[in-house]
Amino acid sequence: MVNYKYSKLVFDYCIYMDNERVKKLIRELIIEIGEDPTREGLSNTPERIASAYKEIFSGYDSNSELSVQFSEDSESVVIRDIQFYSMCEHHMLPFFGKIQLAYSPNGRVFGISKLVRLVEKYSRRLQIQERMTKNIADELFSNGVKGVAVIAQAEHLCMKMRGVRNNANVTTAAFRGIFEKKEEKENIIQIIKNPSKLSTL
């Protein structure tokens, strides 16, 4: 059993976004809000937002593939606390949190950075948490592993800043392969919650 805790964020950029068009649209939005886009403090905002969106929505341009693997005999691999940021597709407000990811290799393991980039591929776009969790699990499982578990915990600003204005967090989970079995599912959940239960390699 292998256990990793991962907190580094890897930055990529959306290369196909029309920067000038985005700046124009943001300027028009500022006017519609009732503000002056030429005043100090706002004059460079369209450019800043266009630049930020290239990074925030880089998942659409991701060609990240889980093709690089290494021979390794391990029952399960657990990667904890993968930080992610995404944008709710309903209100275009952020939701963010951490993902716990586990998989059972079939004789080969993936590089840790590849799995982090897989999370970024599906989080850096207009999303809902439920679909993001499913997307990550499905792609990882499609690469020949015996089982996958993905648990995402997130704060949603669309719920905190508007509407019910509640600070509740949201947890979603997806299980594939052997981890769909009740006993295996319960076991991997306990390992994710309590890494001390891992056997020493």
Feature annotation, model-predicted:
Residues N3-Y6, D12:
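Intrinsic-disorder-associated, low-complexity terminal segments enriched in Asp/Asn/His/Tyr and depleted
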Residues F11-L201:
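A domain-level signal for the structural core that forms small-molecule/cofactor-binding pockets
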